[in-house]
A protein has these predicted regions:
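Phosphate-end processing signature that detects enzymes handling 5′-triphosphorylated RNA
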Residues: 1-200
Length: 200
Protein backbone atom coordinates (compact mmCIF):
# COMPACT_ATOMS: atom_id res chain seq x y z
CA UNK A 1 0.00 0.00 0.00
CA UNK A 2 1.45 3.33 -1.09
CA UNK A 3 0.87 6.22 1.32
CA UNK A 4 1.94 9.73 0.37
CA UNK A 5 1.23 13.43 0.70
CA UNK A 6 1.49 15.76 -2.28
CA UNK A 7 1.62 19.56 -2.34
CA UNK A 8 1.74 22.24 -5.04
CA UNK A 9 4.92 24.32 -5.15
CA UNK A 10 4.52 27.63 -7.05
CA UNK A 11 8.14 27.84 -8.21
CA UNK A 12 11.19 25.51 -8.06
CA UNK A 13 13.14 28.26 -6.28
CA UNK A 14 11.14 27.25 -3.19
CA UNK A 15 12.62 23.73 -3.12
CA UNK A 16 15.96 24.60 -1.49
CA UNK A 17 14.58 26.69 1.40
CA UNK A 18 12.42 23.74 2.44
CA UNK A 19 15.18 21.14 1.98
CA UNK A 20 17.74 23.30 3.80
CA UNK A 21 15.44 24.17 6.69
CA UNK A 22 16.37 22.96 10.16
CA UNK A 23 13.16 20.91 10.25
CA UNK A 24 14.11 18.85 7.19
CA UNK A 25 17.92 18.88 7.22
CA UNK A 26 18.08 17.34 10.70
CA UNK A 27 16.14 14.29 9.43
CA UNK A 28 18.07 13.57 6.20
CA UNK A 29 19.78 10.17 5.97
CA UNK A 30 20.50 10.12 2.22
CA UNK A 31 19.72 12.26 -0.79
CA UNK A 32 19.98 12.13 -4.56
CA UNK A 33 18.66 13.13 -7.95
CA UNK A 34 16.72 11.15 -10.55
CA UNK A 35 15.80 11.94 -14.13
CA UNK A 36 12.37 10.42 -14.74
CA UNK A 37 10.26 9.87 -17.83
CA UNK A 38 7.01 7.90 -17.74
CA UNK A 39 4.51 6.76 -20.37
CA UNK A 40 0.99 6.04 -19.08
CA UNK A 41 -1.30 3.40 -20.57
CA UNK A 42 -4.90 2.19 -20.52
CA UNK A 43 -7.09 -0.14 -22.55
CA UNK A 44 -9.64 0.93 -25.16
CA UNK A 45 -12.43 0.29 -22.65
CA UNK A 46 -10.63 2.27 -19.92
CA UNK A 47 -10.01 -0.68 -17.58
CA UNK A 48 -7.42 1.21 -15.53
CA UNK A 49 -9.54 4.36 -15.26
CA UNK A 50 -12.51 2.26 -14.13
CA UNK A 51 -10.29 0.83 -11.38
CA UNK A 52 -9.39 4.41 -10.37
CA UNK A 53 -5.78 3.52 -11.05
CA UNK A 54 -2.75 4.15 -13.22
CA UNK A 55 -0.42 2.03 -15.34
CA UNK A 56 2.97 3.34 -16.40
CA UNK A 57 6.41 2.43 -17.65
CA UNK A 58 8.88 4.82 -16.05
CA UNK A 59 12.57 5.35 -16.63
CA UNK A 60 14.39 6.27 -13.42
CA UNK A 61 17.86 7.26 -14.62
CA UNK A 62 18.86 4.00 -16.39
CA UNK A 63 16.32 1.71 -14.68
CA UNK A 64 12.91 0.94 -16.19
CA UNK A 65 10.04 0.23 -13.80
CA UNK A 66 6.47 -0.85 -14.57
CA UNK A 67 3.95 0.28 -11.95
CA UNK A 68 0.25 -0.46 -11.45
CA UNK A 69 -1.72 1.67 -8.97
CA UNK A 70 -5.30 0.93 -7.93
CA UNK A 71 -8.11 2.27 -5.74
CA UNK A 72 -6.85 5.57 -4.35
CA UNK A 73 -8.21 6.90 -1.06
CA UNK A 74 -7.85 10.56 -0.11
CA UNK A 75 -7.54 12.52 3.13
CA UNK A 76 -6.14 15.68 4.74
CA UNK A 77 -7.88 18.00 2.29
CA UNK A 78 -6.70 16.01 -0.71
CA UNK A 79 -3.01 16.16 0.23
CA UNK A 80 -2.78 12.51 1.35
CA UNK A 81 -3.33 9.53 -0.91
CA UNK A 82 -3.32 5.84 0.00
CA UNK A 83 -3.55 3.25 -2.76
CA UNK A 84 -2.54 -0.22 -3.81
CA UNK A 85 0.78 -0.07 -5.68
CA UNK A 86 2.64 -2.89 -7.44
CA UNK A 87 5.85 -2.49 -9.39
CA UNK A 88 8.74 -4.39 -10.94
CA UNK A 89 11.72 -3.66 -13.14
CA UNK A 90 11.10 -4.54 -16.79
CA UNK A 91 12.38 -3.50 -20.23
CA UNK A 92 8.87 -2.87 -21.62
CA UNK A 93 5.27 -2.52 -20.48
CA UNK A 94 4.06 -6.02 -21.41
CA UNK A 95 6.98 -7.81 -19.77
CA UNK A 96 6.29 -5.77 -16.68
CA UNK A 97 2.59 -6.66 -16.66
CA UNK A 98 3.51 -10.35 -16.93
CA UNK A 99 5.71 -10.00 -13.85
CA UNK A 100 3.41 -7.81 -11.74
CA UNK A 101 1.42 -10.70 -10.17
CA UNK A 102 4.66 -11.91 -8.57
CA UNK A 103 4.79 -8.47 -6.91
CA UNK A 104 1.25 -8.94 -5.57
CA UNK A 105 -0.84 -7.37 -8.34
CA UNK A 106 -4.28 -8.90 -9.04
CA UNK A 107 -3.86 -11.70 -11.58
CA UNK A 108 -7.23 -11.07 -13.23
CA UNK A 109 -6.44 -7.43 -13.96
CA UNK A 110 -3.01 -8.32 -15.34
CA UNK A 111 -4.54 -11.03 -17.55
CA UNK A 112 -7.04 -8.52 -18.96
CA UNK A 113 -4.25 -6.04 -19.65
CA UNK A 114 -2.18 -8.66 -21.47
CA UNK A 115 -5.13 -9.59 -23.69
CA UNK A 116 -5.92 -5.96 -24.55
CA UNK A 117 -4.41 -3.46 -26.94
CA UNK A 118 -2.79 -0.87 -24.71
CA UNK A 119 -3.20 2.79 -25.59
CA UNK A 120 -0.57 5.42 -24.79
CA UNK A 121 -2.25 8.20 -22.81
CA UNK A 122 0.58 10.66 -22.38
CA UNK A 123 4.03 11.32 -20.99
CA UNK A 124 5.59 12.87 -17.91
CA UNK A 125 9.22 14.00 -17.81
CA UNK A 126 10.74 15.53 -14.70
CA UNK A 127 13.72 15.80 -12.40
CA UNK A 128 13.28 14.47 -8.88
CA UNK A 129 15.40 15.70 -5.97
CA UNK A 130 14.86 13.19 -3.16
CA UNK A 131 15.74 13.03 0.53
CA UNK A 132 15.39 9.94 2.71
CA UNK A 133 14.18 11.09 6.13
CA UNK A 134 14.09 9.38 9.51
CA UNK A 135 11.44 10.82 11.83
CA UNK A 136 10.53 9.23 15.15
CA UNK A 137 9.06 5.82 14.27
CA UNK A 138 9.01 6.13 10.49
CA UNK A 139 11.23 6.37 7.44
CA UNK A 140 9.95 8.42 4.52
CA UNK A 141 11.07 10.04 1.29
CA UNK A 142 10.70 13.75 0.61
CA UNK A 143 10.80 14.55 -3.10
CA UNK A 144 10.69 17.70 -5.20
CA UNK A 145 9.56 17.15 -8.81
CA UNK A 146 10.02 19.67 -11.62
CA UNK A 147 9.20 19.08 -15.27
CA UNK A 148 6.25 18.71 -17.63
CA UNK A 149 3.19 16.67 -18.58
CA UNK A 150 2.47 16.03 -22.28
CA UNK A 151 -0.73 14.73 -23.90
CA UNK A 152 -1.88 15.04 -27.53
CA UNK A 153 0.58 17.85 -28.15
CA UNK A 154 -0.54 19.84 -25.10
CA UNK A 155 1.91 20.54 -22.28
CA UNK A 156 1.42 21.26 -18.58
CA UNK A 157 3.84 21.93 -15.71
CA UNK A 158 5.04 19.70 -12.89
CA UNK A 159 6.22 21.57 -9.80
CA UNK A 160 5.36 19.75 -6.61
CA UNK A 161 6.56 18.21 -3.37
CA UNK A 162 5.78 14.69 -2.18
CA UNK A 163 6.27 12.88 1.11
CA UNK A 164 6.00 9.08 0.86
CA UNK A 165 6.03 6.61 3.73
CA UNK A 166 8.69 3.92 3.25
CA UNK A 167 8.36 2.06 6.56
CA UNK A 168 7.21 2.44 10.14
CA UNK A 169 4.50 4.38 11.94
CA UNK A 170 1.70 5.88 9.86
CA UNK A 171 0.80 8.19 12.74
CA UNK A 172 4.34 9.60 12.91
CA UNK A 173 4.37 9.97 9.13
CA UNK A 174 1.09 11.89 9.18
CA UNK A 175 2.39 14.08 12.02
CA UNK A 176 5.50 15.03 10.03
CA UNK A 177 3.40 15.82 6.96
CA UNK A 178 1.10 18.08 8.97
CA UNK A 179 4.13 19.81 10.50
CA UNK A 180 5.63 20.49 7.06
CA UNK A 181 2.33 21.69 5.64
CA UNK A 182 1.83 24.14 8.49
CA UNK A 183 5.43 25.37 8.71
CA UNK A 184 5.78 26.08 4.99
CA UNK A 185 2.15 26.98 4.28
CA UNK A 186 1.88 24.21 1.70
CA UNK A 187 -1.20 23.85 -0.49
CA UNK A 188 -2.46 20.29 -1.09
CA UNK A 189 -2.23 18.87 -4.60
CA UNK A 190 -5.28 16.58 -4.76
CA UNK A 191 -4.63 15.40 -8.33
CA UNK A 192 -2.02 12.88 -9.42
CA UNK A 193 0.29 13.57 -12.36
CA UNK A 194 -1.86 11.21 -14.43
CA UNK A 195 -5.09 13.00 -13.50
CA UNK A 196 -3.60 16.37 -14.38
CA UNK A 197 -2.20 15.01 -17.64
CA UNK A 198 -5.64 13.65 -18.63
CA UNK A 199 -7.10 17.14 -18.17
CA UNK A 200 -4.77 18.68 -20.76
Amino acid sequence: MEREFKWMIPDPSEFDPIADSSTVSALVQKKGRLEMEAMYYDTADNLIARCHGGLRLRRENETRVVCLKLAAESGFGGARKAREEYECTAPDIRTGIQNLPAAGAPQDICDCLLQANLIELGLTAFTRFWFLLSYQGCTCELAFDYGKLTRNGRVGPICEMELELKSGSEADFDALAVQLQQEFDLKPQPLSKLARMMRL
